[in-house]
């Protein structure tokens, strides 16, 4: 996510400047931060209790360990400036200038490094953000996840399943990506079939290379997929607002496992 400004944090900045503490708990400070993030995300964000103060000295680096929760980092003060590098192992690194009184949200499982050109103080707090929650579900011999970092997607039995609704949550279509192309799922005589089509919306399938037999693909199309676990994200199609729910699935009835450990 891009860097964005945060307002009304002078009380937090003054407290940190006048107190030599590494960790602290303050419900008022939590509310100030959560209100800012709620405004930015337009959803309800819950912070963990502990606020962590980190000081990054000249030419030093602060490394964030990948976590199952999102992480919010605020730049409280900086002499000489600093930059932040974010890597989610899928889309590559994103390097951004990190100004004072700005914040960035680090998605779950992402790696992050703050590099300082001079003494820099940052505030770090973990957060539960509905649109960024990690989802894993195993049903009908399929492992479903909503983050590619949670699954070994090198096997060819991987697919993408997505549900598209309109702004009022009315169903538009279900689509599946398999055999390196998109299909829309249509119903004929109470049975679902995949029909080759364009992808409606903004989803990317560039990291998926799959090969699924037609009978298996039809079987997958007729399953109930756990869309109720997935947050509806706003997208746009031909300038029309739509909502998307997306899951990555791996067909594996022998050995189901998540391929990454998180702390």
From Swiss-Prot:
Domain of life: Viruses
Induction or repression: Expressed in the early phase of the viral replicative cycle.
Protein name, entry field: Protein OPG165
Protein family according to the UniProt entry: Belongs to the orthopoxvirus OPG165 family.
Source organism per UniProt: Vaccinia virus (strain Copenhagen) (VACV)
Pfam hit, one: DUF1235
Keywords: Early protein
């Amino acid at each position: 996510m891009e860097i964005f400004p945060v307002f009304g944090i002078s009380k937090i900045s003054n407290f940190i400047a006048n107190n030599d503490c590494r960790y602290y708990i303050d419900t008022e400070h939590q509310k100030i931060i959560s209100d800012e993030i709620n405004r930015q995300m337009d959803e309800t964000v819950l912070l963990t209790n502990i606020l962590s103060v980190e000081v990054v000295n000249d030419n030093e680096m602060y490394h964030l360990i990948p976590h199952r929760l999102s992480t919010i980092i605020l730049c409280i003060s900086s002499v000489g400036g600093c930059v932040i590098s974010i890597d989610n192992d899928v889309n590559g690194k994103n390097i951004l200038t990190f100004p004072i009184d700005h914040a960035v949200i680090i998605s779950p499982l992402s790696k992050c490094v703050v590099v300082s050109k001079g003494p820099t103080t940052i505030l770090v707090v973990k957060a539960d953000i509905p649109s960024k929650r990690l989802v894993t579900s195993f049903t009908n011999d399929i492992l479903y996840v909503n983050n590619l970092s949670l699954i070994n997607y090198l096997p060819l039995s991987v697919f993408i399943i997505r549900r598209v609704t309109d702004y009022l949550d009315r169903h538009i279509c279900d689509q599946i990506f398999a055999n390196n192309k998109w299909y829309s799922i249509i119903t004929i005589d109470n049975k679902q079939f995949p029909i080759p089509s364009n992808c409606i919306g903004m989803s990317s399938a560039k990291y998926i290379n799959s090969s699924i037999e037609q009978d298996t693909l039809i079987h997958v199309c007729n399953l109930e997929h756990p869309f109720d676990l997935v947050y509806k994200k706003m997208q746009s199609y031909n300038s029309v607002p739509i909502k998307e729910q997306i899951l990555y699935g791996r067909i594996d009835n022998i050995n189901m496992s998540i391929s990454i450990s998180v702390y």
